[in-house]
């Protein structure tokens, strides 16, 4: 996909707690958006990395962890892999690497990646309990909040939005995921419309194909492109209003972003 020269927007894909299917959603949105944009997906969940298992990168030689350790001085390009029409930056799973990583270095990494992308998707940690967890939300232009259609999930998502807004990051939209047939999405959607800044992007049904895709080491849209869940993710990508930002300005903002100690 030829990129729109010099234009970029960064989205954090976030949720209040684990289990919402955030990584599945990040990659599905990425593949759908890659039909129109040059997309880079970054696994910014440095403590509980998961994206590498969804993209067949279990044995990746270089990951985001390597870029976040100053002593290693690894070029950013070495951690970027072409997968499923996207550029993917996985994160490793080593506890030692996580402890050695400096989350603040993520600013420079994202700034460099912004030069070669129209859309950056930051797969963010599910909880906001540390500096490494909150930084992706702080860096992003806007956040996509992934929820399940329950009141507790809605409450958790609102906490993410409240924190994001405290750093000037607005909500791009809400994505309801893993929706079962017996769940009343409409009622929860009405509440979400009242409390969240962005629109409801789509309602994605629970699907066995998602688990099968994970076992195969593939994103859902590659493994089962005609599954109803895949269709819903395409709908979400279509409803996501991607805005134009000057790549140089965005990179400067990333590099100068305030690094919070914790929420």
Please place each PLM-identified region on the residue numbering.
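Inter-motif core of Ras-like GTPase G domains
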Residues: 114-119, 128-151
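Walker A/P-loop phosphate-binding motif and the immediately C-terminal alpha-helix
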Residues: 2-46
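G-domain G4 guanine-recognition motif of GTPases
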Residues: 16, 148-149, 172-184, 203-210
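Conserved C-terminal guanine-recognition region of P-loop GTPase G domains, centered on the G4
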Residues: 155-169, 177
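P-loop/Walker-type NTP enzyme "switch/lid" segment
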Residues: 15, 44-115, 215, 219
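NTP-binding/hydrolysis catalytic cores, primarily Walker-type P-loop NTPases
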Residues: 220-263
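Beta-strand-loop-alpha "switch" segments that mediate conformational coupling across diverse proteins
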Residues: 192-224
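Acidic-aromatic/histidine active-site loop/patch
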Residues: 1-4, 8, 169, 176, ...
């Amino acid at each position: 996909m030829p990129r729109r020269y010099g234009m970029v927007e960064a989205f954090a894909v976030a949720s209040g707690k684990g289990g919402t299917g955030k990584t599945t959603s990040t990659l599905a949105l990425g593949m759908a958006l890659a039909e129109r944009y040059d997309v880079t997906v970054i696994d910014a969940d440095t403590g509980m990395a998961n994206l590498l298992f969804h993209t067949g990168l279990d044995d990746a030689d270089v990951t985001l962890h390597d870029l976040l350790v100053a002593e290693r001085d690894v070029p950013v390009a070495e951690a970027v892999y072409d997968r499923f029409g996207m550029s993917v930056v996985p994160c490793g799973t080593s506890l030692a690497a996580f402890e050695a990583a400096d989350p603040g270095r993520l600013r420079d990494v994202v700034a460099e990646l912004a030069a070669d992308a129209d859309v950056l998707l930051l797969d963010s940690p599910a909880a906001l309990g540390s500096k490494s967890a909150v930084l992706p939300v702080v860096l992003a232009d806007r956040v996509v909040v992934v929820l399940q259609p329950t009141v507790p999930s809605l409450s958790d998502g609102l906490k993410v939005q409240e924190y994001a807004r405290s750093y000037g990051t607005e909500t791009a939209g809400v994505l309801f995921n893993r929706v079962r047939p017996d769940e009343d999405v409409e009622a929860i959607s009405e509440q979400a419309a009242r409390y969240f800044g962005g629109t409801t992007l789509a309602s994605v049904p629970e699907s066995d194909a998602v688990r099968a895709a994970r076992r195969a080491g593939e994103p859902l849209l590659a493994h089962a492109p005609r599954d109803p869940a895949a269709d819903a993710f395409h709908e979400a990508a279509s409803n996501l209003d991607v805005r134009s930002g000057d790549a140089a300005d965005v990179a400067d903002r990333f590099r100068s972003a305030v690094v919070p100690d914790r929420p």
